[in-house]
Every structure is written in structure tokens, then in C-alpha cells.
């Protein structure tokens, strides 16, 4: 963990902080799907998504390996008049509390070992919003990232969450934030035994 922490802290120190950065497009588009309650932002970075969730009334835990990034996240939260709880942790070993969160988001970070923890960490009826890069970036004319360990195979997100109710899925090259990205995006619900709640959520998607 120590080497990764140092590497990411240095990366953030060398980068300029942009407090006006926008949250992820999928979050903004599907804000109506946000439940009430607790949210977890995995690999939260400088907090753009965590703060957006807090602005919509969620109690947010923002987890990242970089203390520098999370300091910036707290600064952003204060500037926006909200609170988030920051947790410095190695996500390779982070134990997500079971049956605890109403919403979990994971953007631009892939560790397949975390998937079971994400599923267990969501309450019944809870929502996962997941978006990260696809394998074969160069075949799309893109050059980052390149390590296949951290890239999704085609339809992999659908397979990983096949036991959830899929509310939204897309996969391909999309232009967002002024750049082209080869990504997969998924919103899914941990199946709730009360079908009326799931039907209500479906109507919100449509």
C-alpha cells in the first residue's frame, strides 16, 4: 500500500486542482435514481462525484488511497456547503461494510476482487452506478489506460452484475468532457423482494 499511496499522492500534488470540475455525466443524467440514505464513492479522488451526491442529500463515504486527493475532496465539500466522510484506504484490501449502503458508485476504477464486496455492501434494493474503461483502447484510437488488468472486456459489467436488475447499460466510445472515451456504464439494482419498489424505480428510468 505504501508505494501506491506515495505514487498517487505525488500524482495529485503534481496536478492542478480544479474545484469547478463537473461530476460524471451518468450521475447528472440519472440523479432521479438516487435513493435516500448512505452512499459510498469508491476511488473518490478529489471528490467531484462524492460532493455531488452530498449535495443531493446523501450521507457520503469517500474512499481513496490518496490522502492528498481526499484533502482536496474535503476542501471542495466545504466550498459547496456540504459534508463528506473521507477514508484513506488501499482499495485492494478495503472491507466494505455489509448491508450498509443505499448507493455505491465506482467511476474509472476496476478491481474485480471488490465486486463481491460491493454486492454485499448494498442494502436490498440498493443501487450500483459503475463506469470505467474498456479493453482495446488503442483499437478505438485512444491511448489510455492500457493495462488490461484494469480494463473491462466487452459486456463484462453485465456479467459481473447478472444477478442484479439492470436499469441502464451502455458500452462504446463516447465524447464527454471534451474528450473521447471508450467506456462501459451500468446502473443496476440489488434485487429487492418487494417488487413494487423495483417497478417504481423502473418508471424513474423510463
Predicted region positions:
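Conserved SAM-binding strand-loop segment of SAM-dependent methyltransferases
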Residues: 80-91
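Conserved beta-strand signature within the Rossmann-like core of class I S-adenosyl-L-methionine
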Residues: 126-133
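A short acidic, Gly/Pro-enriched loop at the edge of an enzyme's catalytic core
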Residues: 94-103
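Conserved class I S-adenosyl-L-methionine
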Residues: 1-34, 37-45
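Conserved SAM/SAH-binding beta-strand->alpha-helix loop
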Residues: 66-68
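A short, conserved alpha-helix within the catalytic core of class I
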Residues: 110-122
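Core SAM-dependent methyltransferase catalytic element
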Residues: 172-206
Amino acid at each position: 500500500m505504501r508505494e501506491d499511496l506515495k505514487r498517487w499522492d505525488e500524482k495529485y500534488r503534481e496536478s492542478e486542482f480544479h474545484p469547478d470540475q463537473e461530476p460524471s455525466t451518468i450521475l447528472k443524467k440519472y440523479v432521479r435514481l438516487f435513493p435516500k440514505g448512505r452512499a459510498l464513492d469508491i476511488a473518490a479522488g478529489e471528490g467531484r462525484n462524492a460532493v455531488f451526491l452530498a449535495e443531493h442529500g446523501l450521507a457520503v463515504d469517500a474512499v481513496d488511497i490518496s490522502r492528498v486527493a481526499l484533502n482536496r475532496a474535503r476542501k471542495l465539500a466545504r466550498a459547496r456547503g456540504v459534508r463528506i466522510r473521507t477514508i484513506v484506504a488501499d482499495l485492494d484490501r478495503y472491507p466494505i461494510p455489509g448491508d450498509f449502503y443505499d448507493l455505491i458508485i465506482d467511476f474509472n476504477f476496476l478491481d474485480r476482487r471488490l465486486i463481491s464486496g460491493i454486492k454485499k455492501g448494498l442494502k436490498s434494493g440498493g443501487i450500483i452506478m459503475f463506469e470505467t474503461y474498456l479493453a482495446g483502447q488503442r483499437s478505438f484510437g485512444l491511448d489510455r489506460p492500457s493495462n488490461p488488468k484494469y480494463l473491462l472486456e466487452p459486456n463484462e459489467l453485465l456479467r459481473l452484475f447478472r444477478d442484479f436488475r439492470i436499469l441502464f447499460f451502455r458500452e462504446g466510445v463516447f465524447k464527454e468532457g471534451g474528450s473521447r472515451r471508450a467506456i462501459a456504464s451500468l446502473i443496476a439494482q440489488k434485487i429487492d423482494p418487494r417488487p413494487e419498489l423495483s417497478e417504481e424505480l423502473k418508471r424513474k428510468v423510463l
